[in-house]
Curated annotation (Swiss-Prot):
Residues of the 4Fe-4S domain: 32-90
Gene3D superfamilies listed in its UniProt record: 3.30.70.20, Electron transport complex subunit B, putative Fe-S cluster
Assigned keywords, A-Z: 4Fe-4S, Cell inner membrane, Cell membrane, Electron transport, Iron, Iron-sulfur, Membrane, Metal-binding, Repeat, Translocase, Transport
Pfam families referenced in this protein's UniProt entry, alphabetically: Fer4_21, FeS
Localization annotation: Cell inner membrane
Family classification: Belongs to the 4Fe4S bacterial-type ferredoxin family. RnfB subfamily.
UniProt cofactor note: Binds 3 [4Fe-4S] clusters.
Organism this protein belongs to: Shewanella pealeana (strain ATCC 700345 / ANG-SQ1)
Record's protein name: Ion-translocating oxidoreductase complex subunit B
Residues the entry annotates as binding [4Fe-4S] cluster 3: C124, C144, C147, C150
Residues at which [4Fe-4S] cluster 1 binds: C49, C52, C57, C73
NCBIfam families: PRK05113.1, rnfB
Length: 189
């Protein structure tokens, strides 16, 4: 046999042995997570914005599972808070006004000042910023959660947080609050 074939066979056998060892170790030392934490995390919006006072949605889910309040997630809003309260078996509370943003704001990039460094793109947890290296960037306002994480990394300070204008598209319509009268159809004779 040539030296190359022997080397390939030896490396293949080593790879198989190490693969089996790693597979065994992964099963033997597997850490089981809290299923309640997983359920709570599934309900959270996964923006990783930190507005709740925790560094991301997973740490906040762990805190809720350990007894923290369920009303600290502004991006999730009242609907998420009610689902969390139902899951935890507690009474729904209004969103914590010290944590919640009163007026929804979104990031706005002054494109004429943008140098295209991509630091804001890397900081955005919901991929709401478009752009590429050395080119201007822009924000997709429909995706922006207003978490403010893109402002600090900007080296030229060209990102502003502006309130969302109230239009028919952004208005919080409460259609269930409008009474609807059901009309009975006349049957043909």
């Amino acid at each position: 046999m040539s030296a190359i074939v022997i080397a390939i066979v030896v490396l293949t056998i080593l790879a198989l042995v190490f693969g089996v060892l790693l597979g065994f170790a992964a099963e033997k030392f597997k850490v089981e997570g809290n299923p309640l934490t997983d359920q709570i995390e599934a309900l959270l919006p996964q923006t990783q914005c930190g507005q709740c006072g925790y560094p991301g949605c997973r740490p906040y889910a762990e805190a809720i599972a350990n007894g923290d309040k369920v009303n600290k997630c502004p991006p999730g809003g009242a609907a998420t808070m009610e689902k969390l309260a139902d899951l935890m078996g507690v009474e729904p509370e209004p969103l914590n006004v010290t944590e919640a943003v009163q007026i929804k704001k979104v990031a706005y990039i002054r494109e004429d000042e943008c140098i295209g460094c991509t630091k804001c793109i890397q900081a955005c947890p919901v991929d709401a910023i478009l752009g590429s290296g050395k080119l201007m960037h822009t924000v997709i306002t429909d995706y922006c959660t207003g978490c403010d994480l893109c402002v600090a990394p900007c080296p030229v300070d060209c990102i502003d947080m502006l309130p969302v204008e109230q239009t028919t598209k952004t208005w919080n319509w409460q259609l269930n609050a409008i009474p609807v009268k059901q009309l009975q159809e006349d049957k043909p004779c």
